[in-house]
Design a protein with these regions (language model features):
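Acidic/histidine-rich catalytic cores of soluble enzymes
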Residues: 375-470
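N-terminal pre-domain/capping segments
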Residues: 246-341
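Active-site acidic/histidine proton-transfer and metal-coordination neighborhood
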Residues: 288, 320-413, 498
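Conserved, mostly hydrophobic/aromatic
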Residues: 261, 281, 289, 306, ...
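Carbohydrate-interacting regions of secretory-pathway proteins
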Residues: 20-257, 307
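Acidic-and-aromatic substrate-binding clefts and catalytic sites of carbohydrate-active enzymes
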Residues: 266-272, 288-300, 318-326, 350-353, ...
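Hydrophobic faces of well-ordered beta-strands that scaffold small-molecule active sites
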Residues: 257-262, 289-291, 313-318, 342-344, ...
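Bacterial Sec-dependent N-terminal signal peptides
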Residues: 1-22
Length: 511
């Protein structure tokens, strides 16, 4: 009897879940969402190059819109389908399910008046890639993975930490368009962000398959498209919310100002061409930099380059030996940069052997340097944690010892979120414990599945875009706001900074 009742309950629950497909909740209706597929008809759609819905190649069955298989060729069966309406600012949400080896796409800003091609092909538009990365050869074409699932096809790859589900399971794609700002989301996680029409966007187009198409991706409005690529792909819960343009000057509900970035994030390009890299950083919407290197320049030269671009340096990072042996030079460089803080991020020690003697020496040196910097130059000294300090010591950790024995008048702290989390400490707990001792923060995320330790090191590919890793960044920022953090800096040590930093910045703006 129990099994029978359980089975009936399961069936009822399944029926209830299925009944919610292709419907809007009361909350969604209130927010302005509209269905683009009712689960029964193809109302609201037509062929990309014909004035009616295709007679073949597409099927509505069991509440699903399906691309019928036809050998994997592009638009040779029914062809693509597009909406009857143009859109500009919007949030689009689509559930899709891939079959093995399948390829499709969700396109936006599609010009409905584009010429009909002489040979079958997909209609032109910006494409959210829908692909079986493991089995379809297109995943290995293009550049740096820019043809993999959720990428902006042939232009920008999605972050490597994207949460794609297994073939045969339902994924949710979301595209957000606000003016020229566009975001791709996969299963509730932002995986890509870019600015249509920016110099960076135009440069990518110039190196892509779209290079000979004038004005590609620059239309003010356009249709939405589901692609027929000759493989079986299912769609459901296709819905859109038209939005009003929001100027991209907001920092988010939690952050009062748009965060900055650590120069180490762009260390390689800054070393090669400092001014061009500053231009790129500003184009991303970042104007506050913590410099941890002068990159072969004089501090005054960097300040001049920053001033010319309306940018600033609020913190200057230097090495431990320099605060001991070159404190005057450090202070003068910080002042020349316009910084208010001087930061040290590493206490020299033998690998795997951080001792109380080392901690005591650091406390002595930090107190001395902090006193000089404050009293002689009006600068605030900060120590930046790196993981090894959280090894147990007496009833706490070496970090607790450093906190307890440094003079709060002269020594403050910069929290590196990843290097708190990596050795197993909750950043929120630490912020609550030491509150106002923190003045600066490096905002970073750690790839899911990575188990940390006290080494103070991890592979650079374990730095992932904010919101895609293990750390509850929203909770950290909320706690940090209460502690009085003055400057937040995005730091990303990976090789994918040009992909990940825009995602991280957009993520923070959503908080």
């Amino acid at each position: 009897m129990f099994r029978l009742i359980a089975g009936v309950c399961t069936l009822l629950l399944t029926a209830q879940v299925n009944a919610q497909d292709n419907q809007l909740s009361a909350k969604e209706k209130k927010e302005g969402w509209q269905l683009l597929f009712d689960g029964k008809t193809t109302t609201g759609w037509k062929g990309a190059f014909i004035n009616k819905f295709p007679e073949k190649g597409w099927k509505v069955e069991d509440g699903l819109l399906m691309v019928e298989p036809s050998g994997g060729a592009e638009s040779t069966n029914g062809g693509d389908i597009i909406t009857l309406k143009d859109y500009d600012n919007f949030e689009l949400s689509v559930d899709f399910k891939l079959t093995e080896g399948a390829n499709s796409g969700i396109k936006y800003f599609v010009d409905a008046k584009q010429a009909t091609p002489s040979n079958p092909r997909s209609a032109l538009g910006l494409e959210y890639q829908v692909l079986d990365d493991a089995r379809h050869p297109d995943a290995k074409l293009g550049k740096n993975g820019d043809r993999t699932i959720s990428s902006l096809y042939d232009l920008i790859p999605a972050v490597s930490s994207k949460p794609a589900k297994a073939i045969g399971e339902w994924n949710n794609a979301k595209v957000v368009s606000n003016g020229n700002h566009v975001e791709h989301w996969l299963n509730g996680i932002m995986v890509l962000a870019y600015e249509r029409g920016s110099d960076a966007f135009k440069a990518l187009v110039a190196e892509s398959k779209y290079k000979d198409i004038p004005g590609f991706g620059l239309g003010k409005m356009g249709r939405l498209l589901l692609q027929d690529h000759g493989n079986k792909v299912y769609f459901k819960n296709i819905k859109i919310k038209e939005t009003k343009f929001m100027p991209d000057t907001r920092s988010g509900r939690l952050l009062k100002e748009i965060p900055g970035v650590v120069s180490y994030t762009f260390r390689n390009s800054l070393q090669k061409n400092l001014t061009a890299t500053l231009d790129s950083i500003k184009a991303m919407g970042l104007t506050n930099i913590e410099f941890s290197n002068l990159f072969g320049k004089k501090a005054a030269e960097i300040k001049e380059a920053l001033d010319a671009r309306g940018m600033k340096c609020t913190s200057f990072g230097t090495g431990y030996p320099d605060i001991v042996n070159k404190i005057t030079e450090v202070a003068e460089n910080a002042k020349a940069l316009g910084a208010s803080f001087v930061r040290v991020a590493w206490i020299p020690h033998d690998k795997g052997n951080f001792t109380i003697e080392t901690a005591k020496k650091a406390v002595e040196d930090f107190n001395k340097a902090g006193k000089i910097l404050k009293e002689n130059y009006g600068l605030t000294f900060c120590y930046h944690n790196h993981g090894y300090e959280f090894q147990p010591y007496e009833n706490g950790t070496f970090y607790d010892y450093i906190m307890a024995n440094t003079n709060p008048d002269y020594v403050s702290f910069e929290m590196d979120v990843l290097w708190v989390f990596h050795p197993g400490i909750n950043p929120v707990d630490l912020l609550k414990k030491y509150g106002s001792r923190y003045k600066l923060m490096h905002v970073k995320d750690l790839r899911k599945g990575i188990v940390g330790n006290f080494s103070g090191g991890t592979a650079i590919e374990n730095d992932v875009a904010l919101g895609t890793g293990q750390i509850d960044i929203a909770a950290v920022i909320k706690a940090a706001q209460k502690s009085g953090i003055q400057n937040y800096y995005i730091e990303d040590e990976s090789k994918d900074v040009n992909i990940q930093v825009p995602v991280s910045l957009s993520f923070l703006k959503h908080l």
